């Protein structure tokens, strides 16, 4: 199936074509027709499955085809500023030819720029709960005309203690609305919240990306931030690294790294959302033709890249969303070719590495024989193997379908056995102490 077969309007198809999207992911294929009909949706899907486009594209289309009344018509609530920014960047791409305007608001930064954006008028508001409630209480936001509400990563919202904020938001928005509810997991608390928010929803479940390609050799280098560029230049002296795709978290970081490499006479170009379509296409063509040895990309830009035969992928900065790692390294080793994925990890990125290894269920081999290795990194990596093995073992115990209850039943059984094991150990320890 193609996006054209989903009955999308021409301005959106044009934007998707420029982004490089041709084929919808499973969740997009299932969700877009449902949402275009105006139905509520309950989606069990993780970040990395394409769920942002699954709700953003139909929202943009319905707003484009509406009567264009003023005011905020769609609210997307997210747990973190990083996710809010990422969703905002997606809207930049998909809504570019529609005139549908959006704003992103989150805490931890001054309010003025966000308030100014709201005053200019937006139809879509992407927000974290705290800043949304702050600005609403100050009279900067009115949600009375809201028609669409998206709650993203609901389980993470609960983990972070946002349940009361969500309840406050629900009191501020109209009861008659289309509601989209996404969660990576569906424990009883989430099901209860979903039931209170949704009306006869369509239910969609998408298996998350959790395994990496077999033909890819992975490794991690522990290195401090200020020495990453030196390590990269050291590695690029190896002529076997013929064609390399490097990932950064920010557009500024991509541009800066391209300048560093070009200054060292290593042909490099950056590709990201601030580049014009012609500039992105030129950089991509140069990389495919091997005119340029290094292509540096942000994750948003990389989703539109179709390159099959680069030898190496380098995570210059680890992604803060673990599923993104799987998508990044999946771009090497395509079409039966062996790929090599190298990751740089500074001390502040250790939590990201831990999440990545938990997701893929293995310990990424550490390269220690380089001049910039950090002792802190080696210590943090030590002792993780058994933990990951146990995690993988537990996953196998309760693997099954979430929709028919097998997954949750087996998970509960596994957790019960683990709890009994801990109680037995406690009793033995107590006996020894007595």
Regions found by a protein language model. Give the residues of each.
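Conserved helicase RecA-like core
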Residues: 2-377
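Basic Arg/Gly/Lys-rich low-complexity intrinsically disordered segments
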Residues: 289, 359, 363-434
């Amino acid at each position: 199936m193609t996006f054209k077969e989903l009955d999308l309007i021409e301005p959106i198809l044009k934007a998707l074509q420029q982004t490089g999207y041709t084929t919808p992911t499973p969740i997009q294929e299932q969700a877009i027709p449902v949402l275009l009909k105006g139905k509520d949706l309950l989606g069990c899907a993780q970040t990395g499955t394409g769920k942002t486009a699954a709700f953003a594209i139909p929202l943009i289309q319905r707003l484009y085809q509406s009567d264009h009344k003023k005011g905020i018509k769609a609210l997307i609530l997210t747990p973190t500023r990083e996710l809010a920014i990422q969703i905002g960047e997606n809207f930049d791409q998909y809504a570019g030819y529609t005139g549908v305007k959006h704003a992103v608001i989150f805490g931890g930064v001054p309010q003025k720029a966000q308030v100014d954006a709201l005053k200019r008028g937006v139809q879509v508001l992407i927000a974290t709960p705290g800043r949304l409630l702050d600005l609403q209480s100050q009279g900067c936001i009115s949600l009375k005309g809201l028609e669409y509400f998206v709650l993203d990563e609901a389980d993470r919202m609960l983990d972070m203690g946002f349940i009361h904020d969500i309840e406050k938001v629900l009191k501020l928005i109209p009861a008659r609305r289309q509601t989209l509810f996404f969660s990576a997991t569906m424990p009883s608390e989430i099901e209860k919240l979903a039931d209170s928010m949704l009306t006869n929803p369509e239910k969609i479940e998408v298996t998350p990306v959790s395994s990496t390609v077999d033909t890819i050799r992975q490794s991690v280098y522990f290195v401090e931030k200020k020495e990453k560029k030196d390590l990269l230049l050291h590695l690029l002296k190896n002529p076997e690294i013929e064609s390399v795709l490097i990932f950064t978290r920010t557009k500024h970081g991509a541009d800066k790294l391209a300048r560093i490499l070009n200054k060292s006479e290593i042909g490099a170009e950056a590709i990201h959302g601030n580049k014009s379509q012609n500039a992105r296409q030129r950089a991509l063509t140069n990389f495919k033709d091997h005119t340029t040895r290094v292509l540096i990309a942000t994750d948003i830009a990389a989703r539109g890249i179709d390159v099959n035969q680069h030898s190496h992928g380098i995570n210059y900065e680890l992604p803060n969303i673990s599923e993104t790692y799987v998508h990044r390294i999946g771009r090497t080793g395509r079409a039966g070719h062996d790929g090599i994925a190298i990751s740089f990890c500074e001390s502040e990125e250790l939590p990201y590495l831990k999440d990545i290894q938990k997701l893929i269920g293995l310990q990424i081999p550490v390269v220690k024989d380089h001049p910039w290795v950090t002792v802190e990194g080696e210590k943090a990596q030590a002792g993780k193997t058994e933990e990951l093995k146990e995690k993988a073992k537990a996953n196998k115990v309760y693997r099954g379908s979430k929709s028919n209850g097998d997954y949750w039943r087996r998970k509960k059984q596994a957790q019960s056995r683990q709890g009994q094991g801990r109680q037995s150990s406690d009793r033995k320890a107590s006996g020894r102490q007595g």
